[in-house]
């Protein structure tokens, strides 16, 4: 795959696909974390004389955070110390004229890509190549730089459609992500411990199955809803209140899959030995084998318990490789952040090379000032797909583009 230093950019028009999809409250962006993550790429391109066309999506139609990229332009302008012009168009006449009139060192950002219907669907590279978006913009572009790792598991026109038409290059963030995740996945150092939590149970089961079957993991520690599904798969009763919640979420049907994983890899999958419930507005820890587990019938599980945290901590401190995705509980409520904070602090204190991803995981790391983690990934679904052994469409497109244009390096 091409790296950003493989080409010179003076006077060249560069289409930069970033992922600036950010949390929004009351119509305003509340975090600039994703903007800061792509700054090194943007700065490199501008410093080297590129005419820069930035593009991103923001949410999806009919959701509350589905807004224009006008504020994205303002945030980028502030962080860069130079104007990034908001272009209220995607591939229409106005956008094309503005791209054609760019001067070296100038930057614009196109309108929210998902305002275009073509950008909402996943399609093959061949189909994406034929979209109006790609056909209209390709003649105006010299290079495509992709820094949207968080969207690398999607196959949409802006992400893969230019791969066979123009050199498609990894941005600095993409390069860092691919290098870190590959190091964790391919490492032969042991023990290799995966921590799977949160609510993306099906994705986590795919990861567990893949890394255990391929010998990439020595132990899997579970929490969040992933931990509850594996606990049920081991034959424990989590009570009516929690069974009903999992049923409403459509997760009970995944218990059979978890059982199959346990049938094959039982000793390597660890589940919580205690849980914390919301007992009349307060945290109450209940041992899975204790007499108080009848409380599970009435009160929801919102975290793993302290005994589980200690057991997990011992394992993590002795690990050589750690991959973690998803929180251990409802960390947004401070009394139920014990599991998430305890486990992530242990990861930070461990001498292991560690990779942590997922939006909620990252939020908890920053909220509780957890340090010492080797790599915090911007990808949630993309990271899970990577460790599930799936080929990410954007990485596939980068490889295809490299094979097609490798003779043009340093032109």
Curated annotation (Swiss-Prot):
Pfam families noted in UniProt:
PGK
* Reaction catalysis annotation: (2R)-3-phosphoglycerate + ATP = (2R)-3-phospho-glyceroyl phosphate + ADP
What Gene Ontology biological process does one annotation of this record name? gluconeogenesis
Keywords, A to Z, come to: ATP-binding, Cytoplasm, Glycolysis, Kinase, Nucleotide-binding, Transferase
Tell me a Gene Ontology molecular-function term this record carries.
phosphoglycerate kinase activity
Its EC number is 2.7.2.3
> Cellular component terms, GO, for this chain's entry?
cytosol
Q: Which cell locations does it reside in?
A: Cytoplasm
Q: Which Gene3D superfamilies match?
A: Phosphoglycerate kinase, N-terminal domain
Q: In which pathway does it act?
A: Carbohydrate degradation; glycolysis; pyruvate from D-glyceraldehyde 3-phosphate: step 2/5
Residues the record lists as binding ATP: 332, 358-361
Main enzyme class: transferase
User: What family is this?
Assistant: Belongs to the phosphoglycerate kinase family.
Self-association state and partner proteins as the record states: Monomer.
UniProt protein name: Phosphoglycerate kinase
**Which species does the entry assign this protein to?**
Thermococcus kodakarensis (strain ATCC BAA-918 / JCM 12380 / KOD1) (Pyrococcus kodakaraensis (strain KOD1))
């Amino acid at each position: 795959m091409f790296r950003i230093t493989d080409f010179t950019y003076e006077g060249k028009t560069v289409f930069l696909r970033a992922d600036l999809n950010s949390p929004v409250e009351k119509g305003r962006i509340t975090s600039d974390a994703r903007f800061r993550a792509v700054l090194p790429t943007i700065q490199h391109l501008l410093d080297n004389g590129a005419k820069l066309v930035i593009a991103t999506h923001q949410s999806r139609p009919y959701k509350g955070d589905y807004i224009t990229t006008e504020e994205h332009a303002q945030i980028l302008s502030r962080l860069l110390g130079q104007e990034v012009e908001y272009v209220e168009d995607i591939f229409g006449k106005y956008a094309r004229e503005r791209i054609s009139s760019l001067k070296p060192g100038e930057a614009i950002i196109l309108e929210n890509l998902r305002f275009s219907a073509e950008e909402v669907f996943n399609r093959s590279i061949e189909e994406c190549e034929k979209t109006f978006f790609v056909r209209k913009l390709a003649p105006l572009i010299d290079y495509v730089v992709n820094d949207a790792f968080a969207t690398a598991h999607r196959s949409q026109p802006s992400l893969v459609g230019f791969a066979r038409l123009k050199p498609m290059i990894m941005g600095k963030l993409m390069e860092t992500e691919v290098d870190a995740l590959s190091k964790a996945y391919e490492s032969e150092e042991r023990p290799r411990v995966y921590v799977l939590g949160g609510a993306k149970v099906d994705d986590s089961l795919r990861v567990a199955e893949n890394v255990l079957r391929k010998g990439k993991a020595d132990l899997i520690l579970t929490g969040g809803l992933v931990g509850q599904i594996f606990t049920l798969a081991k034959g424990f009763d989590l009570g009516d209140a929690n069974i009903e919640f999992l049923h409403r979420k459509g997760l009970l049907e995944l218990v059979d899959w978890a059982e199959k994983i346990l049938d094959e890899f039982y000793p390597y999958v660890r589940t919580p030995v205690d849980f914390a419930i919301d007992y009349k507005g307060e945290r109450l820890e209940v041992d899975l084998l204790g007499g108080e587990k009848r409380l599970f019938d009435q009160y929801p599980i919102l975290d793993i318990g302290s005994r589980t945290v200690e057991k997990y901590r011992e394992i993590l401190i002795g690990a050589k490789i750690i991959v973690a995705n998803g929180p251990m509980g409802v960390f947004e409520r401070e009394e139920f952040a014990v599991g998430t904070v305890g486990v992530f602090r242990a990861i930070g204190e461990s001498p292991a090379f560690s990779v942590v991803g997922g939006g909620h995981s990252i939020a908890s790391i920053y909220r509780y000032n957890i340090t010492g983690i080797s790599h915090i990934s911007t990808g949630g679904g993309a990271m899970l797909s990577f460790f599930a052994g799936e080929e990410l469409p954007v990485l596939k497109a980068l490889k295809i583009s490299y094979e097609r244009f490798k003779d043009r390096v340093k032109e």
